[in-house]
Amino acid sequence: MSAPPCVAEVKVESYVFPATVKPPGTAKTLILGGAGARGLNIDGKFVKFTAIGVYLEADAVPSLAVKWNGKSVEELTDSVQFFRDIVTGPFEKLTRITMILPLSGKQYSEKVTENCVAFWKAAGMYGDAESKAIDKFNDVFSDQMFPPGASIFFTQSPLGSLTVSFSKDGSMPEIASAVIENKPLSEAVLESIIGSKGVSPEAKQSLAVRLSEMFINGGDAISGKVGVENDVIPQTVVVSK
C-alpha cells in the first residue's frame, strides 16, 4: 500500500476541501485529486451552483502514472481517456458536492440521473438493472433539501457499490444514507462530473494540474505524512450545461 502523496487543500468560493478525508463506505483515507465549481453562463454571467471535490485512494497516483506520467497538463485536460481511467480505475473514490445555491434533492437527482441515462444509452448499456438503480437513487434523494453549505458525498468502490451520504454543514458524515450495488451507476455519477460531457471543467482542470504534479514529484512527494498547504482555484472557467 502506497503512503499518501503530499497534497494541498483547495478552496472553492468559501468552501474548503481538505487534503484528506475518511468517508463512509471505506476504511481508507483518500487524498484530494482536484476541486472546482459547477455553474452555468446565464445572460453573460457565470452563476455557480455547486462546489465539487474529487478524492482518490493514494494508490491511484502510481496506478495512473504508469500510463499518464510525462503528459503535460494540457494533454491530460484534453484527454477523454485520462478522465475515463480515473472513473474506472481499480481504486476507491469519493466525490463531494457542496451547495453554493440551494437545491432540492429531487432537482439534483433528476439532473444527475438524466446525465447518467444519456451516457448509458450512448454506450448501449442501459438495461433493467440500471433502471432499478436509478429508481433507488431517486428515492434516496426524494425527501432531501440542500441549503447553501450542505453536501452530498458519493463513495465509489472499485467493486461496484455507490455509498451515498449527506451533511448539512459540509463535515464528513459518519453514517451512510444508502448503498446502491450497481457499478455502472457508481461510475456514471463520476463520469457526469469529469467525463467528456462533465458538468465541471474546473474540477477536471484541477485534477489534471494536481495529478500531473503528483506524477512528476511522486518519488519525493510520497511520505508517511501528508503536507497541507493552501491552494485556491481561480474561478474563471465557463461551464456549459
Swiss-Prot record:
Coiled coil: none
Isomerase among keywords: yes
Top-level EC class as recorded in UniProt: isomerase
GO BP field: flavonoid biosynthetic process
Signal sequence coordinates: none
Note: Part of the biosynthetic pathway for all classes of flavonoids, a large class of secondary plant metabolites, many of which are brightly colored.
Function statement: Catalyzes the intramolecular cyclization of bicyclic chalcones into tricyclic (S)-flavanones. Responsible for the isomerization of 4,2',4',6'-tetrahydroxychalcone (also termed chalcone) into naringenin.
Designated name of the protein: Chalcone--flavanone isomerase
Species per Swiss-Prot/TrEMBL record: Ipomoea purpurea (Common morning glory)
Taxonomic lineage from the root: Eukaryota, Viridiplantae, Streptophyta, Embryophyta, Tracheophyta
